[in-house]
Structures are given as structure tokens and as C-alpha cells.
Design a protein with these regions (language model features):
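Glycine-rich phosphate/adenosyl-contacting loop at the front of the ribokinase-like
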Residues: 1-71
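Conserved N-terminal subdomain of the carbohydrate kinase-like
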Residues: 46-130
Length: 130
């Protein structure tokens, strides 16, 4: 089994809304280590994910997504802290700009004391990202 550890967030793509006072948002599951876990699982590799994930709406969606992709979520720590958001906006030339909302968020608050005392015996590789 490959264990990936790190970011679990939503990329939120912001575009002009239907009026001058609105913005259209499209949120997608993201985070490099989370994406690695999903990609490995899709390739048939047994995979687990270790992070701290919120109990908020976004966090529940992250867990549901990982489970739907057959990624083991048993090592995930749950919390009331909010989910990290990465806002992506395009300028007039289509160049993206990024704003990260990470202050006090779940995946940034994993403490050493919350790590498992021992990894499952099946873990052969650990990937830690961003």
C-alpha cells in the first residue's frame, strides 16, 4: 500500500457572474497528495490518505470523493476547523492568479500528537506533499 500525506482542499474557480455584483464559482477537489492518492488508486494500487479533514460540507465531500475512488480514509483525522480553499481567477489575458485561504484550516492543523503511533503493516511507500 502507498500512503500519501498532505493537503486536502478545494480549488474554487471564480469567473464573472451574470451581473456586475456577482461571481460564479466552481469548486473541485484538490491538493497534490490527495490527487496522487486518487491517481494511484485508479491505477490499481492500494492507497491510503493521511491528513486532517474538516467536518464541514467541503470536508464531507472530500471524504466521500476519496471513498468513491477506493482510497483508504482510516488514517484521516476529523476536525471542526474549516477546509482549505484555493481561489483561482483568470485575468483578461487568461493568466491565473491564486489566493489561498489556509489560516486555521483543517489540513494545516495536523499535530504530531494526532499522527498514528504505528503505520499499518501494508504500507510500503509514504508520499508526503505540499
Amino acid at each position: 500500500m502507498i500512503l500519501t500525506c498532505g493537503d486536502a482542499l478545494f480549488d474554487v474557480f471564480a469567473t464573472a457572474g451574470s451581473s456586475a455584483s456577482s461571481i460564479a464559482l466552481d469548486a473541485r477537489v484538490g491538493g497534490s497528495p490527495l490527487n496522487v492518492a486518487v491517481a494511484l488508486s485508479r491505477l490499481g494500487q492500494p492507497t491510503a490518505f493521511l491528513s486532517k479533514v474538516s467536518n464541514d460540507h467541503f470536508g464531507r465531500k472530500l471524504i466521500a470523493y476519496l471513498e468513491s475512488e477506493r482510497v483508504d480514509v482510516d488514517l484521516i483525522v476529523r476536525t471542526a476547523a474549516p477546509t482549505t480553499l484555493a481561489i483561482v481567477a483568470l485575468d483578461d489575458k487568461g493568466v491565473p492568479t491564486y489566493s489561498f485561504y489556509t489560516n486555521g484550516t483543517a489540513d494545516r492543523s495536523l499535530a504530531v500528537s494526532e499522527l498514528p503511533a504505528r503505520l499499518p503493516d501494508a504500507v510500503r511507500v509514504v508520499h508526503i506533499g505540499s
